[in-house]
């Protein structure tokens, strides 16, 4: 019988990246569920009901130590996907440094659990730089003495999310698309609300500590099928021409050219689609029951 975790003292739950796509929704879910939360971001925001805001820089251990003081459970949602071309070129090093800094600060502050949202790919072939970095971050966080729950998610779909923005702009703006072979990769897209359900569920179930859990939605489809589904909802015809030699790097520049999604953000999104990302291990679904949304609802 798993132990249901409850909050032991006010504001002892930390959400890092609290101003981001996932972080904002996680904050709302936690507070709606009756928890009081400490929200960490690079910029300072005013406190709100049941949310205490703290400002910290993931490259400054001292600020992280202050942010994690008194924290029992920390949600790790930090990444280095956006930024300048120079920052993109160094993203793996930056993500490694962030994770090492956070682990040191969390250890010094006596944090009891870390819950990390990573990416799901079916390993076998060589991972892209982006997905390798996401897995490496999980290993760094788990290398200490704090139990880590790593949730590896397939493509996350929801308003404000990078994958959704790329999908929406491509389908809405272009009558036809020239696409590389990665549009045929199998994915198990998951609604952002369900990702948040899994994050909160992992926190509540103590038996998830120390485990890597794969999460995805109820539908398995290619990214091309996902684009066609969205176009059908808009009642639009979508013509796709596949070009096998179009590399992820060239794809990201093309997306930058035809949509508002910057190449620095498009590149990791495309990289995450190069590999199949389908749930093979159902342990996460068994340990954290979630009512999953079909893509027709999530889009």
Regions found by a protein language model. Name each.
Residues 35-42:
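Conserved glycine-rich Rossmann-like NAD(P)H-binding loop of the short-chain dehydrogenase/reductase
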Residues 2-12, 198-265, 276-299:
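Mid/C-terminal beta-alpha module of Rossmann-like enzyme folds, strongest
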Residues 133, 162-163, 182-204, 211-214:
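Substrate-positioning beta->alpha
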Residues 2-35:
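N-terminal Rossmann NAD(P)H-binding glycine-rich loop of SDR-like oxidoreductase domains
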Residues 92-96, 126-138, 142, 156-157, ...:
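Short-chain dehydrogenase/reductase
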Residues 118, 139-160, 166-169, 173, ...:
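Conserved beta-loop-beta element that borders a ligand/cofactor-binding pocket
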Residues 16, 40, 77, 114-119, ...:
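SDR active-site strand-loop-helix element
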Residues 45-109, 119-125:
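NAD(P)H-binding glycine-rich loop region in Rossmannoid oxidoreductase-like domains
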């Amino acid at each position: 019988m798993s132990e249901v975790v409850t909050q032991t003292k006010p504001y002892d739950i930390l959400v890092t990246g609290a101003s981001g796509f996932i972080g904002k929704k996680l904050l709302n879910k936690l507070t709606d569920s009756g928890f009081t939360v400490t929200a960490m971001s690079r910029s300072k925001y005013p406190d709100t009901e049941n949310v205490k805001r703290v400002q910290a820089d993931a490259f400054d251990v001292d600020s992280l130590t202050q942010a994690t003081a008194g924290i029992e459970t920390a949600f790790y949602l930090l990444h280095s996907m956006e930024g300048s071309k120079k920052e993109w070129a160094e993203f793996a090093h930056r993500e490694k440094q962030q994770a090492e800094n956070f682990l040191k600060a969390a250890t010094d502050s006596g944090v009891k659990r870390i819950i990390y949202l990573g990416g799901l790919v079916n390993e076998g072939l060589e991972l892209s730089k982006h997905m390798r970095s996401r897995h490496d971050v999980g290993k760094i966080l788990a290398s200490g003495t704090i139990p880590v729950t790593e949730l590896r998610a397939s493509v996350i779909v929801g308003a404000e999310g990078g994958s959704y923005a790329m999908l929406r702009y491509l389908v809405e703006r272009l009558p036809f698309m020239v696409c590389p072979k990665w549009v045929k990769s199998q994915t198990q897209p998951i609604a952002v609300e369900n990702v948040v359900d899994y994050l909160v569920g992992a926190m509540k179930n103590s038996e998830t500590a120390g485990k890597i859990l794969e999460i995805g939605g109820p539908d398995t489809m290619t990214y091309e099928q996902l684009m066609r589904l969205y176009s059908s909802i808009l009642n639009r015809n979508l013509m796709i021409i596949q070009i096998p030699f179009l590399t992820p790097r060239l794809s990201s520049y093309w997306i930058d050219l035809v949509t508002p999604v910057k190449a620095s953000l498009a590149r990791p999104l495309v990289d995450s689609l190069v590999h199949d990302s389908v749930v093979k291990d159902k342990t996460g679904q068994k340990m954290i029951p979630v009512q999953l949304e079909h893509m027709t609802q999530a889009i």
